[in-house]
Amino acid sequence: MKFKEELVKELIANSNREMAIPMENYMKNNFSFLGIKTVQRRTIFKSVYEKHKSEIKSNYRTITWELFQEKEREFHQCAIDLIQKEIKKKFILEDIKLIEKLIITNSWWDTVDFI
């Protein structure tokens, strides 16, 4: 999937280990971070999203799950941004299973509160 590949590439290219350390500490070292602040992460996400809309529209559930399985928290946050953007328009009953998986995978207040 080109969207996920490009998003991963862009986020890693913009990682900042100095910023990651306090982020990890804030989350009690439960997750690794790339060190990308929210505004920058959302800018990167939006840029990559715009290039791959057609792929995303038909595969957003799979992409969301794949991003949520990545190690760094920024990927989980992008997964939340993606599902928030898409699920409102196309919610089906089976999405509850995906939402349940997201709640129990890498769960912590920052993602569970949204879900």
Descriptions of predicted regions:
Residues 1-115:
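Alpha-helical scaffold domains
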